[in-house]
């Protein structure tokens, strides 16, 4: 790595590691705006994914953490874990490991009620699989606020009939109310990413608000539909024509995958699951 690249990727004596997808947030104005969007309250159960050097961690701790109710954080980089422990002490409870394998439900309060808030500047190289991993814990979560690549956020909030509407749109919109909150330019980071970023808010639907469906089957149906985006659904969903009477359902196969609303995919998946 050249000296200039090293300097650009160095912040507070730490060089950003590409394999961890590290881009450290450094713009204090942006940090303040993000915290204002999150609105942390004293004593809340909150976990930060990928705290990095603590740019977001510090103001979150100031607003919500107590020794009895610390901010939780999941971090993979062991060098950063040591620094964070030294800086924040008992106000930050660190969990060393990969967020893709972490049991976020273990941090929720006992009982069935949603109690956990999740935040983070997510590594862009694992953002989609991490978002899918988090759906398993949606029933324990109050809300999620994430920094993501703007292109991913646009897909998350996309409406049917638009090019951005995708498998990610369907699967996440089934589980969450999703809203884009804030645009973040590359220069807010060190090193600056090559893409624009955005803050997104995700509020899980309560279980009684969800149409009952086997999410594994829903995922299979949606994956098949979007497997060849330019083809009509009569081709991509052909394997389901024996189990689903699409005409009786009022499901038009003369459409492409991006033209179908979430609730229609759910109805197809319900029938497929019932006949399995």
From Swiss-Prot:
SUPFAM superfamilies: S-adenosyl-L-methionine-dependent methyltransferases. Pfam families: RrnaAD (PF00398). Its EC number is 2.1.1.182. It is an enzyme of class 2 (transferase). S-adenosyl-L-methionine binds at residues 23, 25, 50, 75, 98, 121. GO terms for cellular component: cytosol. The keyword DNA-binding does not apply. SMART domains: rADc. The keyword Methyltransferase applies. It catalyses: adenosine(1518)/adenosine(1519) in 16S rRNA + 4 S-adenosyl-L-methionine = N(6)-dimethyladenosine(1518)/N(6)-dimethyladenosine(1519) in 16S rRNA + 4 S-adenosyl-L-homocysteine + 4 H(+). Coiled coil: none annotated. It is found in: Cytoplasm. Keywords: Cytoplasm, Methyltransferase, RNA-binding, rRNA processing, S-adenosyl-L-methionine, Transferase. CDD domains: AdoMet_MTases. Its main location: cytoplasm. GO terms for molecular function: 16S rRNA (adenine(1518)-N(6)/adenine(1519)-N(6))-dimethyltransferase activity; RNA binding. Belongs to the class I-like SAM-binding methyltransferase superfamily. rRNA adenine N(6)-methyltransferase family. RsmA subfamily. Specifically dimethylates two adjacent adenosines (A1518 and A1519) in the loop of a conserved hairpin near the 3'-end of 16S rRNA in the 30S particle. May play a critical role in biogenesis of 30S subunits. This is Ribosomal RNA small subunit methyltransferase A. It comes from Paraburkholderia phytofirmans (strain DSM 17436 / LMG 22146 / PsJN) (Burkholderia phytofirmans).
